[in-house]
Amino acid sequence: MLLTIDVGNTFTVAGVFEGQNLLAEWTVTTDPNRTMDEYGMLFTQLMARAGFSSGQVTAVAIASSVPPLVPTLEWMCQKYFNLKPLVVGPGVRTGMMIRYDNPREVGADRIVGAVAAFDKYGGPLIVVDFSTAIILDAISARGEYLGGVIAPGIVVSADALFQFAAKLPRVELVRPPRALARNTVHAMQSGIIFGFASLVDDLVERMMAELDPEGKGCKVVATGEQAELLAGECATIQYCDPSLTLTGLRIIYERHQAHARGGR
């Protein structure tokens, strides 16, 4: 059984695979102040509630957008699972060529999502990750990572409105009944939900013009914590796949293992 852990700036998503099947998935708050033991107890308890034991885990793969947490999770894996995890980063074979000025600048989560998306949907392709930031990544028809766009996420933007506009309340991030709002809460929800959907559609169209100028068929897939909330509001998004990064971790782990066996 493979345990996959995707550490984002706001949330950490974990899942267990048996072969290609995702058996269970959990989302917890990312907290750099948690200790190795706190993370160990958290993951083992979540697994136990789903009917799994730590002894069933034979491998761990990690992608992290929070570098200080990597050593904590590595120690946690060694203590609670008796395993050395595969941490996706420079030097790990992903099977994807990275066409970026400095490949080391690209976050592991972006590459992991791109690998899974190309494997599942083919290219050319744009991956829209609705997380702490909204990140759009482009993959060529040949499976090359070409770069992308980073914009503020909806939670960050909503919090900024609450913090810096004295009369605006903190609002629940849900779809309002209409775009033309008749109260402040709905007006903020309209601006956030419909506004960011329009932002994504415009960015996708601009990227498509460069990625697929002949219009042969560029696919667009959404992932991330807010994917299910926003994907349906975006005219350009064709697929919604919230578990994309976990799938990418599985694929990269399998490729890494295949390369290690071939190298012996």
UniProtKB/Swiss-Prot annotation:
Pathway info: Cofactor biosynthesis; coenzyme A biosynthesis; CoA from (R)-pantothenate: step 1/5
Binding-site list for ATP: D6, V7, G8, N9, T10, F11, T12, V13, T132
CDD domains xref list: ASKHA_NBD_PanK-III
Enzyme Commission number: 2.7.1.33
Binding sites annotated in the UniProt record for substrate: Y100, G107, A108, D109, R110, T184
Subcellular localization(s) per the UniProt record: Cytoplasm
GO molecular function (one): ATP binding
Any one of the GO CC terms: cytoplasm
Catalytic residue positions: D109 (proton acceptor)
Keywords from the named record: ATP-binding, Coenzyme A biosynthesis, Cytoplasm, Kinase, Metal-binding, Nucleotide-binding, Potassium, Transferase
Reactions performed catalytically: (R)-pantothenate + ATP = (R)-4'-phosphopantothenate + ADP + H(+)
PANTHER family assigned to the protein according to its UniProt record, in alphabetical order: TYPE III PANTOTHENATE KINASE
Protein name per Swiss-Prot or TrEMBL: Type III pantothenate kinase 2
Organism: Symbiobacterium thermophilum (strain DSM 24528 / JCM 14929 / IAM 14863 / T)
